[in-house]
């Protein structure tokens, strides 16, 4: 009797467990979106209903400390490796490696030498090594062959490709026959305009509104593809932006002989490579030359920047105060908005918002580090993290206390495109969910009745058997 009882119990337990959850996807899905140069307080400069919709229905971090230097390529590589710039090797947008005797330049799009990228392993490679698929639409570095690998799907960088076309590719990859579980999407604004006009310009308002409109378009497309409630959407950036002016310019030619050094990287962190035998002369001429310029020998760079332990960091690094601009002379290009300054400055900090089945709702956290995103992604995707500088414990409170699981999609009547009122709170479950739970409950009840009948019959049979045992000795007497 015991084996039959156990079999029935196991069958009941299996059905009770599986029925309500049979509609759930097998794994978490994550989409990371970066709006380049989106400073943390842009959310409040003009109405941003779609950003606030995510904040209301997901999580928001007020202050994200990114890595020094606060530029595009170092910080985008930090987001996907969890490493400081000195550890992942992309120390600037423009670099010189004395070991390789090669240069790296974002300005000239000379960025495709794999050796510059292979001091670290981006998470899309780890994800693919675990048997999953990844996709990247214009994410910086994703079109570079790193450790003999590209993302499963990727778009070669082309600034002319529209945001809508990039979104279409992301949706296609998430809904393919062999879908991705990890996607990356990059957009150049508001960084481009921020450089041109400066973050304090009234012209920035329309650009921020347009980025919000594009986020609304992404939300609409995710809902249309029935992905909104099943994909964990993370919206972030690489850095902020500060206002500059031509009245705050530091000209290196006023202090240095240009024949004595090579300027590897420019404002606001000048990476200076002195010519052979000219180190002391260059350093002495520049140190103390301007009250708004701090000059470091490489070994004297502050530890808090985690920046000096890499061959690509030049022997002399000159850092301008916030809002000050470094030029060789006034004939060089000047930008009204700039970034790259000390990562402790609030104006250098980017945004961080997230929505999805793994995240809490209407929750705001005060602070995190950009290095923490990598460990969060590894946790969501159940990947073994490689060594990194972030901390999962620093961001675990962003997650729902319940075991993260995607929920079935339900169409909202509000598409969140161009609306100032993004609509009502999201539904937590849909009709398919309730149908699944109901079917599971009915099946459980049926098997419970069958089990009770089985137990009753077993008891009757046992009583009859015992009666025969009791009567048997009397017959023998």
UniProtKB/Swiss-Prot annotation:
Its EC number is 3.1.-.-. Glycans are attached at residues 101, 158, 292, 329, 362, 369, 382, 389. Changing residue 73 to F: Can hydrolyze nucleotides, with about fourfold higher rates for adenine versus uridine and no strong preference for diphosphates or triphosphates. GO terms for molecular function: dinucleotide phosphatase activity; NAD+ diphosphatase activity; zinc ion binding. It comes from the Eukaryota. It is found in: Secreted; Membrane. Residues 1-24 form the signal peptide. Keywords: Glycoprotein, Hydrolase, Membrane, Metal-binding, Secreted, Signal, Transmembrane, Transmembrane helix, Zinc. It is a single-pass membrane protein. Zn(2+) 1 binds at residues 36, 72, 238-239. The active site is at 72 (nucleophile). Binds 2 Zn(2+) ions per subunit. Zn(2+) 2 binds at residues 191, 195, 339. Can hydrolyze NAD but cannot hydrolyze nucleotide di- and triphosphates. Lacks lysopholipase D activity. May play a role in neuronal cell communication. This is Ectonucleotide pyrophosphatase/phosphodiesterase family member 5.
